[in-house]
Structures are given as C-alpha cells and as structure tokens.
Curated annotation (Swiss-Prot):
Function: Catalyzes oxygen-dependent 5-hydroxyuridine (ho5U) modification at position 34 in tRNAs.
UniProtKB keywords: Oxidoreductase, tRNA processing
Catalytic activity: uridine(34) in tRNA + AH2 + O2 = 5-hydroxyuridine(34) in tRNA + A + H2O
Name of the molecule in the record: tRNA uridine(34) hydroxylase
SMART domains linked to this entry: RHOD (SM00450)
Organism of provenance: Klebsiella pneumoniae (strain 342)
One GO BP: tRNA modification
Keyword Repeat attributed: no
UniProt region (Disordered), positions on chain: 315-354
Gene field: trhO
Family annotation (InterPro entries): Rhodanese-like_dom (IPR001763), Rhodanese-like_dom_sf (IPR036873), Rhodanese_C (IPR022111), TrhO (IPR020936), TRHO_N (IPR040503)
Catalytic machinery residues: C200
C-alpha cells in the first residue's frame, strides 16, 4: 500500500519549493456537504493532489471540506476539473484566488480528518447548518455599508480584525469561533430588527455563523459571498470602491494580503503604525504578534528581552527549558490573553452593541 503522507523533512520541502521556477497560485475553497467516509476521501484526494503537485492544508469531516492550497499555474485548471468530477457536490466549486501571491504560501501537503471543518462547538441536534443567510455580492456589500439599519459582524479572530476590517464592523471579543457564536447572539439579542451581515476571510465561518443566527431567531441575515477575498477581487474588477480597510490576515506564510493602503494597527512593542504579523523566533514561544522593522532588529525577531536571551542559548539548553514548561508554554496559542500577558498590552474595552 502506498504511503499516503509526507515523509520528507519540512526543511527539505521548503528548500525544494523555493527552488521551483514555475509560478504557483494560492487558492482557498470550502464546501459544506455530506462526506460518508472522510478517511477514504482523504486518501483518494492525497493520491490525486500529490500528482498535481498541490501543497497546502486541507481539512475533511462528515460536514465537508476546507482547503488552503497552492498549485502550479499550469495545473490550476486540471485541479478544477478533478474536483468538479470528484463528487457531484463539488461541481461548480468556487475557488478564492489569493489577492497578493508570491507563490510561496505552502511547501507541504497536509490532509487531516476532523470532527468538523470549522470548530463551532454546536451540539444542538435541531441546528440546520444548511439554513444559511443570503449571499451578498460586492455591489450589495457596499450598499449595505451605507444602510443605517445594517450591522456588519466580523467572525474572525482578534488578530485578524486588528489589521483590517470593514468600516464600523462589530468585533466579537472571543478567542475562538466556537466562543464567538453565542456572543454574537447575545450582543445582537436586542437588535433583531437590524439587517445582519456576517463576514470572514473566505466565507466558511460566516456561512455557518449566518445559519446559527437564523437558528436563534434572526431573520434578516446575510453573509458575504466568498468572504473578504472574493469581495475585494470582484469590487476591483467591477471598478467599485473597496470598503475593506487595511490588510486581510491569511493563514499561510504570507500572513496577510494588502487590501487598502491604510495601516490601522500598531507595533505591539513600540506602538508605531504597523500591520506585519510575525511569530516570535524563540522556539519556546512562537507568539503571534505585530512587529515593526525597527523592533524586529532590536529584538532579533523575538517578542521580548527574555525570549531574545533564551533564543541565544545553545539548542540543547533551549530544549531543556521548553521541556520543563507546562503545556510547552502553549506554543502557537493565539489567544488575546497570552498576547496581553507577554507584551503588557491592556485588554480592549468591550465591543459595544449596535
């Protein structure tokens, strides 16, 4: 039986990707549909996508598929044709093409089977995830932004909202999508007469969130078709004003796509205008934070003096320190609380209801 997972080191794979000469296209897509056997589907996809030289991250569950990938430009149409024919539910699948792309977003293919393609924490058997809000296209989004009865709700994480969002969009103060869902209902409970517009990066979170709002008695619910990525692309193509301000955070090596020239965030170390995310170079930390070029040089890519000193230690000493920390210091934990603790950033004031 063939090996259906990667067995080459990340370092080697990254070097191979960087040495490639053919341009790559970064694509995201998702689809809610019933997958009877996610593991068998995963294995079949692995074989086909490996042949197409696809890199990236794909999650499968009984509720559907969620993918962020890169593919050689010459294979984009072959990938589209393969997916359209792979399952009837994928016929006509929308590809969200990256707005800014150097082709270096991924260097390894990972396919994982999960309980859900979006961790929503919903265990209500009466919830119908297919009963979603109506789609909004780019022109409709701009019209809604000018409608005083419309409320835009950002269903992304705090670090995504911080660097870019729609004008006057409501931030839901929670560290995870599963925590945002009940908070969104709570914050809008007294405003069921409002028109609610949900949005996220590529559409997968806001689609489910729109169904959750309808499940909780909200009737005027929309979500942006294809999320921020598709909105910005279509608005530019149609010559419409792009009303998203700042940068769109993305979950790959790029960490962001510039949507407007506005820089609305600040360096977490010195406070200078900046919207460049990075991970602390100390392997015992890897805190996700915003760092300007000056502080990157001053702190050698680390988030604090303590991490600078630890990063200077011999690798063996660093490993011993990491092993002695409870839960590995919660590496890759992106919670606002951890960011505030590490960098002394005060907790934001609670978002106001509309």
């Amino acid at each position: 039986m063939p090996v259906l997972h990667n067995r080459i080191s990340n370092e080697t794979l990254k070097a191979q990707m960087l040495a490639e000469t053919e341009p790559r296209t970064t694509i995201s897509f998702y689809k809610y549909f019933t997958i009877v056997d996610p593991q068998a589907t995963r294995d079949a996809l692995w074989v086909a996508l490996t042949q197409l030289k696809v890199f990236g991250r794909i999650y499968l569950a009984r509720e559907g598929i969620n993918a962020q990938i890169s593919v050689p430009e010459s294979n984009v149409e072959a990938l589209r044709e393969f997916l359209y024919g792979f399952d009837p539910a994928l016929a006509g699948l929308r590809f969200n093409i990256a707005l800014e792309d150097d082709g270096k977003s991924f260097w390894v293919l990972r396919l994982k089977v999960r309980d859900r393609i979006v961790a929503d924490g919903i265990d209500d058997p009466s919830f119908d995830a297919s009963n979603v809000g109506d789609y909004l296209k780019a022109a409709d989004v701009n019209a809604m932004l000018d409608d005083p009865d419309a409320v835009f709700i950002d269903m992304r994480n705090h670090y995504e909202y911080e660097v870019g969002h729609f004008e006057n969009a409501l931030e839901i103060p929670a560290d995870t999508f599963r925590d945002q869902l009940p908070k969104a209902v709570e914050m809008m409970q007294d405003h069921k007469d409002k028109k609610i517009v949900m949005y996220c990066t590529g559409g997968i979170r806001c689609e489910k969130a729109s169904a959750w709002m309808k499940h909780n008695g909200f009737n005027k619910v929309w979500h942006i078709e294809g999320g921020i990525i598709e909105y910005a692309r279509r608005a530019r193509e149609q010559g419409l004003p792009v009303r998203f301000i700042g940068k769109n955070f993305v979950f790959d090596e790029r960490m962001g796509e510039r949507i407007s020239d506005d820089v609305i965030a600040h360096c977490h170390q010195c406070g200078a205008p900046c919207d460049t995310h990075t991970n602390c170079l100390n392997d015992g930390c890897h805190l996700l934070f915003i760092q300007c070029p000056s502080c990157a040089e001053k702190f050698a890519g680390c988030c604090s003096e303590a991490c600078v000193e630890e990063h200077k230690l011999p690798e063996e000493e660093q490993r011993k320190l990491r092993a002695g920390r409870e839960n590995g210091n919660k590496i890759f934990n992106k919670s606002r609380g951890r960011l505030n603790t590490k960098l002394g950033i005060p907790e934001p004031e609670s978002s106001e209801k509309p």
